Amino acid sequence: MSEAAEVSKQAYNIAVDTIGETWAQHLGSEFSKQYMKDLSATIKSERMSHVIYPEPQDVFNAYLITPYDKVRVVILGQDPYHNGAADGLAFSSKRENFIPQSLRNIFKEIGYAAVKSPNLQRWAEQGVLLLNTCLTVRKGLPNSHSKIGWQEFTFRTIQSLNDKEEPVVFILWGAHAQKYQEYIDKKHPILTSPHPSPFSAHRGFFGSGHFNWVNQYFRDFDKPEINW
């Protein structure tokens, strides 16, 4: 086996362990690239001197819980909660007693009669990829890891999803998420609105009807609906 092939095999094996086999088939080569090596080293160093969220075993949960071949919807977030509630899924909280304001507004838009668990794994298991564009953060410092290389990896993730033959619904809330719209082919439905944060939800997120639209879209194609 050539040195290049050996490196490629090692990168693929690391990817399988990190993001699961179906994602590794599309993103495995990223793990041999210098930016990913630098990113890994930076996070390792950061964890030695700072509290970093989410916990190491949760960083890639979006990939592990929603395999590539199961992705039907993508909801794009920014970075994890910096208060210890991050579980690796965008907008989700692992603390049952902590429902962030953005998530409260999401639940309100869905129309929940009663507040449900803030853990959104139930969505991820149905094919909703809850992907932050930055997968780690320092405690108490939002966007603190926004320039260490994560965006390159999540950009490659979006590119790989864009290549799917089966249309994927992309939900892009707010200006940050909408920057990625230009990289998504028109064959994929794209839903946009202001972010569900308390500062912008009343400017068009409320009443956007995205959750109903998604399920109507799946009904039209005889696909299973998402149980939001």
What residues fall within each predicted segment?
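Generic N-terminal amphipathic, Lys/Arg-enriched alpha-helix
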Residues: 9-10, 14-27
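A polyanion-binding, active-site-adjacent surface
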Residues: 22, 29-172, 176-184, 188-192, ...
